[in-house]
């Protein structure tokens, strides 16, 4: 089962979305100033789940494709996938799977 955790690093907080195989699947595009705000952001992401929009982009550092989950109306990025993929189709498929799993993930 996929799950969110909240971690603290360098004075900020972020949620991480963990896949069932134990790797980090996604994180927020920007950190948060408090544990509470990071926790609420993870809860809102899980609540939005299947309504989120999946988009792909080319990572400027690696040149590989990645996915992100965007707000369904504003298209604001809410989550960015960790993995890099050779093709946009691979990234899209992984993002679709993550979107589905996000809706069922618990927040620790």
Question: What are the residue ranges of the model-derived segments?
Answer:
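Tandem-repeat architecture and repeat-register "anchor" residues
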Residues: 16, 27-28, 48, 81, ...
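A short, charged, amphipathic alpha-helix used as a generic interaction element across diverse proteins
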Residues: 33-49, 86-103
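Intrinsic N-terminal pre-sequences and regulatory tails
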Residues: 1-5, 107-108
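Charged, amphipathic alpha-helical segments
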Residues: 1, 45-55
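Short aromatic-glycine-(Arg/Gly/Cys) micro-motifs in beta-strand/loop hairpins
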Residues: 3-26, 58-78
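Intrinsic, low-complexity N-terminal interaction/targeting segments
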Residues: 37-43, 54-56, 65
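A short, exposed loop/beta-hairpin motif centered on an aromatic-Gly-Thr core
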Residues: 23-35, 76-89
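Mixed-charge, Lys/Arg-enriched low-complexity segments
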Residues: 50, 57-62, 66-74, 92-108
